[in-house]
Curated annotation (Swiss-Prot):
Post-translational note: Phosphorylated at Thr-24 and Ser-29 by MAPK14, which mediates the degradation by the proteasome of EGLN3. Phosphorylated at Ser-29 by DYRK2; this increases the ubiquitin ligase activity and promotes degradation of EGLN3.
Its EC number(s): 2.3.2.27
Family stated for the protein in its record: Belongs to the SINA (Seven in absentia) family.
MF-aspect GO terms: ubiquitin conjugating enzyme binding; ubiquitin protein ligase activity; ubiquitin-protein transferase activity; zinc ion binding
Source organism of the structure: Rattus norvegicus
UniProt entry tagged with the keyword Transferase: yes
Name of protein: E3 ubiquitin-protein ligase SIAH2
Predominant location category: cytoplasm
Region feature Disordered, mapped onto this chain: 1-43
Binding positions for Zn(2+) 2 per the UniProt entry: 169, 176, 188, 193
Name of the gene: Siah2
Transmembrane residue ranges: none
Cellular component GO terms, alphabetical: cytoplasm; cytosol; early endosome; neuronal cell body; nucleoplasm
Amino acid sequence: MSRPSSTGPSANKPCSKQPPPPQTPHAPSPAAPPAAATISAAGPGSSAVPAAAAVISGPGAGGGAGPVSPQHHELTSLFECPVCFDYVLPPILQCQAGHLVCNQCRQKLSCCPTCRGALTPSIRNLAMEKVASAVLFPCKYATTGCSLTLHHTEKPEHEDICEYRPYSCPCPGASCKWQGSLEAVMSHLMHAHKSITTLQGEDIVFLATDINLPGAVDWVMMQSCFGHHFMLVLEKQEKYEGHQQFFAIVLLIGTRKQAENFAYRLELNGNRRRLTWEATPRSIHDGVAAAIMNSDCLVFDTAIAHLFADNGNLGINVTISTCCQ
C-alpha cells in the first residue's frame, strides 16, 4: 500500500521521498478559532500538497547513579566488546583462546577480532557470567548524559526508553533516517522538512484537505505555545482489512517528563454533532505507532469523518493547556 504524507499549505510533503511542487495556500474556514491552517494531502493522481559505574549488586537491586571509582571502571572494562565497545552481557561466549565478543557482533564475525581464532564451537564463560550478575553496568548513553547504572537484566529495557538516547525524525511515515539530540530536532524539521506549517497559539484549527484520497495518508503540522512545539498528526490507514480509520494525536517535541506538564484536546464539531478526545501529549521519543496500535488517540472511521467534513475537508479544533502539578 502506498503511503504518501502531507503537511501544511504552500509546502512540499515532509514525509515522502519526492516532494511535489508548491501549493497555493488555502484560506482558513470562516468559523475557525483564532488560528487556522489548511493541510492538504497528496495521493495518487493528486498534485496538491498540504500543509561507567560498576557496583557490586544482585539481580533486582535496581539502578543507581554516583561517582565512578577507578576499580569499578576497571572491572566493567573487562566486559567491553572489542568491536562495538558496548558490554558483553550474559549469555557470554568466548573464542577458544578466551576472548569475549558481544552476541550482536558475534553473529557478524567469522573469527575472533582479537586473536583471529575460531569462534566455533561456542564456549560459555560461566565465571564471567557470574561476575556480570554482581555488577551494575553504565547505560550505553552515559556519554550523552545518562548517569544510571543497572543490572544486566534491566539494561536493555532501560536503554529502549532512556531519555538520553538519540531522537529520530518524528515525521510519521517518513523515509527520513535522521537521528540526533532533542535540541537538534526543531532545527532538523526546519531545514529538512520546510513544508511543515507552524501555527502560534494554544487554540488552533488543524484543517486536513482531501480526506477522501485512497490509501494511507498522513497530515502533519506544528503548533507553538507555552514555549514548546507540538506536532499534530492525522493518519488515515487500514488498520483492519476493508476498514479505513483516522487516527489523530499530539506529540510534544520534548521529553516524557515535559509532556506530563501539558494536556491536549481534539474536537470535531459541526452539523450539531461533537466528538472530543482529551489526553496527555506523547513525547516524540515514543512516536505514534504504539498509540495507533492501542487506539490511544482520537479514532474515527470514514463514516464519522464524513459527518464533520465539508467538501472533503476536515477541521479539527486543537487546544493545548498546562497541567497543575
